[in-house]
Design a protein with these regions (language model features):
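Sec-dependent signal peptide recognition
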Residues: 2-9
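C-terminal motif of bacterial Sec signal peptides marking the signal peptidase cleavage site
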Residues: 15-18
Length: 196
């Protein structure tokens, strides 16, 4: 009887210890590459909202929430803070290659102060060819975010291609209705500014 109680106590201790370790263990963060379509109209329509935490586009219906970190329309970024949303997101663009950015700075961030004063200015990160309607991301530009919920992420725009509603490439004289973005990012789930 004593042996049975003793073994039960050991088993419960091991189970409790295992559960505790699982609860506090961080899910490893890693580089992700995604493609998604955004509105190709430079002057109107909805922004495509993106969540680093979920790694997916967020419905426009959730624009007044903390479920998204940044939005894109054509080549215009909005950040979920101040003038553009209820979150506490901030961003800065570093003149460093993506792989060289191993941690987030603790200062130097910007937010959308008004509808016309955005944290990210278009020509900071790309050149545009008006004949081919092609955006070319500038090499060595890395976006570093404080997300809407106060965590850290880094991002690089790999491609921004003119496309139709199905995401298929278009060339002049066809006008694109969408821009197909390819992004690489690292979201630090544990809340530290470390990207390694």
């Amino acid at each position: 009887m004593k042996r049975s109680i003793y073994l039960t106590a050991i088993a419960m201790t091991m189970l409790f210890t295992a559960c505790t370790k699982e609860e506090v263990a961080d899910v490893p963060s890693s580089d992700q590459t995604i493609e998604f379509l955004v509105n190709g109209n430079p002057s109107g329509g909805n922004f495509t909202l993106f969540s680093f935490e979920k790694g997916v586009a967020v419905p426009t219906a959730d624009s007044n929430s903390l479920k998204w970190d940044f939005g894109l329309r054509f080549e215009t970024f909005i950040i979920n803070s101040k003038a553009s949303g209820p979150g506490n997101a901030f961003v800065q663009i570093l003149n460093q290659p993506y792989t060289a950015v191993t941690s987030a700075a603790l200062s130097g961030y910007k937010f959308d102060t008004t509808a016309s004063q955005k944290a990210i200015k278009g020509l900071e990160w790309y050149t545009y060819n008006s004949i081919t309607r092609q955006f070319s991301p500038i090499a060595g530009k890395t976006f570093v975010f404080v997300t809407a919920n106060g965590k850290y992420a880094k991002m690089e725009v790999l491609k921004a291609d003119p496309a139709n509603d199905n995401g298929e490439p278009v060339t002049p004289p066809t006008r694109p209705t969408r821009i197909k973005y390819t992004l690489r990012y690292f979201y630090q789930k544990n809340g530290t500014p470390n990207f390694q």
